[in-house]
Design a protein with these regions (language model features):
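PLP-dependent amino-acid enzyme catalytic core
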Residues: 1-145
């Protein structure tokens, strides 16, 4: 997957650059994917329903393809999500995933934990420690941990 700068679309980056840098220092722009792949409906229509980790793996795979092997991605997801969120019916055809079942009871358990585990993966062979600095209103820092 290729990522582009929100302030200069001629700037391209790979997933590692996007996640480790967060933003383009020259422009101040954020990196975003150049495309947003659709999740195959056959995954969501399985009976029994796929686990949260299975869905997370299939959602993340196109964004990291060529940079994180499948077995490493599965390990990152297992480490980031050692909990199973609840999906509850809202009505006959709609469901809601409750985002307060992670370790900090905050929605950030779902995004921040994956980001931190991915950054740790890319830093695993480096000689310098990885420090993630977050601005927080209270739940972000603990979700990254």
């Amino acid at each position: 997957m290729i990522y582009t700068d929100t302030r200069d679309s001629s700037v391209k980056a790979d997933f590692k650059t996007a996640v480790m840098g967060g933003m383009n220092q020259a422009t101040g722009g954020l990196y975003i994917p150049v495309e947003f792949p659709k999740l195959d409906s056959s995954l969501l229509n399985k009976d029994p329903a796929p686990s949260f980790r299975d869905v997370a793996f299939n959602m993340a795979k196109p964004y990291v393809e060529g940079e994180i092997p499948d077995n490493d991605l599965a390990a990152i997801i297992a480490d980031a999500y050692p909990f199973q969120p609840k999906v509850v019916p809202a009505d006959a055809i709609s469901y809601i995933m409750e985002l307060f079942h992670g370790p900090t009871c905050a929605f950030k358990d779902f995004g921040a934990r994956f980001m931190a585990r991915t950054m740790s993966y890319f830093n695993r062979n480096e000689d310098t420690p990885l420090h993630i600095l977050v601005a927080t209103s209270g739940d972000t820092g603990s979700a990254v941990g």
